[in-house]
């Protein structure tokens, strides 16, 4: 919640009110993908806890396989939001907000990575102090990158900052999670889909200025 509001606060200080409005609009559309993931995790979290407590040693393998379809659904929703960002923003907002299109696309990539941050390994292991420390690290990274990027690029800088934090922090978070309760992810499928998703959205971002 702090980071969600802090981005806007930093834009307000370091950039213009117009940039704040554009970012706020883009963030609202992109946030639908995170809201979808939050609703979806109410389906699988109870099952994961059950497997963790039932089979403390071998549960990680069944959990990894069980989570793959939910990862598909989450990534697909992020993909739809990113790919159709231009159509959605163009149809539903006045021209002054059309600068939010790229922001929606970038934030959709950032929210896609949050699927891995929703897994409850550290809570199951009782490592709440470690979890708090990791969250504080994430906040500090976000603050530092926001200060550097918003000052130079405005609202786009805030979106890139959120994506950069996701790309750096997610692997760190996953290392600690796997250390305390190992989930046997179907890595090949996940990396292939993430590669397709990121290359598609990045390709669209770079191609947009040349497309009618």
Question: Whereabouts are the PLM-identified features?
Answer:
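Interfacial/gating helices of multi-pass transporter permease domains
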Residues: 11-31, 98-101
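Transmembrane helix-bundle signature of multi-pass secondary active exporters and lipid flippases
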Residues: 23-42, 73-77, 107-114, 165, ...
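Alpha-helical transmembrane segments of multi-pass membrane transport and lipid-handling proteins
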Residues: 37, 60-113, 143-151, 201
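Membrane-interface junctions at transmembrane-helix termini in multi-pass inner-membrane proteins
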Residues: 108-137, 177
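Transmembrane alpha-helical segments of multi-pass transport proteins
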Residues: 138-141, 187-212
């Amino acid at each position: 919640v702090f980071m969600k509001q802090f981005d806007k606060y930093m834009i307000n200080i370091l950039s213009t009110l117009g940039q704040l409005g554009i970012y706020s609009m883009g963030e609202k559309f992109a946030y639908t993908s995170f809201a979808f993931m939050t609703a979806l995790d109410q389906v699988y979290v109870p099952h994961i806890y059950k497997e963790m407590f039932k089979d403390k040693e071998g549960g990680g393998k069944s959990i990894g396989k069980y989570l793959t379809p939910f990862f598909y659904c989450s990534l697909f929703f992020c993909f739809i939001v990113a790919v159709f960002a231009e159509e959605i923003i163009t149809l539903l907002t006045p021209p002054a907000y059309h600068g939010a299109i790229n922001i929606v696309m970038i934030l959709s990539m950032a929210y896609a990575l949050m699927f891995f941050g929703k897994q409850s390994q550290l809570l199951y292991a009782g490592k709440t102090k470690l979890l708090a420390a990791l969250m504080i690290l994430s906040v500090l990274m976000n603050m530092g990158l926001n200060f550097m990027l918003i000052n130079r690029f405005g609202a786009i800088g805030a979106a890139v900052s959120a994506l950069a934090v996701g790309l750096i922090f997610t692997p760190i978070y996953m290392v600690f999670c796997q250390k305390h309760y190992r989930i046997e992810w179907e890595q090949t499928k996940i990396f292939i889909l993430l590669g397709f998703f990121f290359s598609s959205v990045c390709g669209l971002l770079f191609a947009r200025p040349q497309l009618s």
